[in-house]
Amino acid sequence: MAFAAGAVVFPGGRVDPDDYLVARQHGPDVHEADGAARVAALRETLEETGLAVGWPALQERELADVRRALLAGTLLSDILAARGDRIALDSFVPFARWCPNFKEARTFDTRFYAVAAPPHGHELTVEEAEHSHIFWASAHRTLMMADRGEVSVIFPTRRNLERLARVADFDEFSAHSRQFPVELVTPWIEWCEGQSFLCIPDHLGYPVTRESFDRVRRG
């Protein structure tokens, strides 16, 4: 990836024009950008990992063919129309929206959603055009791996992992998310006692709202 190269990230990617069409056809009554981002989350997770979230009609034996079609450029709207399927965009729980400005060549307005993983028996495999490998791990374990230097975790990912690590399961996290607004988070720098800290608002459900800039750079 051009952004956060080598870092551990959640599945996801760019919202495509077709995602807006799918959101209008299948989406709940939400803002069009929110609906399209939910579609992108569904599509990118399937493309990148082979896991189908929010698509109850898609059988496990059909996953590989649908994934290949998406990766080959077939539009999701055409696949859904041909199959006559409905996707469950209301199953995606919005919990964060970040737009960091770290003086990168590009900035990313990124929406984060939680969704229940469906039961599955197949092995998830990486889509190698953008990622080197994938793995399942709890938020707590991933934070421990980062603290030991086994993986690199950028500032927004660490803050979201810390939120996830506070709860036991999807239902508990969904309830937690509903207690806080989803507002655009753009971190800023503050100085305190000769140190610089990267900070975020303290009313959005994050247990840690600042981190020393030296540690942020270390990832």
For each of these PLM feature ranges, what is it?
Residues 1-219:
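N-terminal leader/linker segments that precede catalytic domains of diphosphate-processing enzymes
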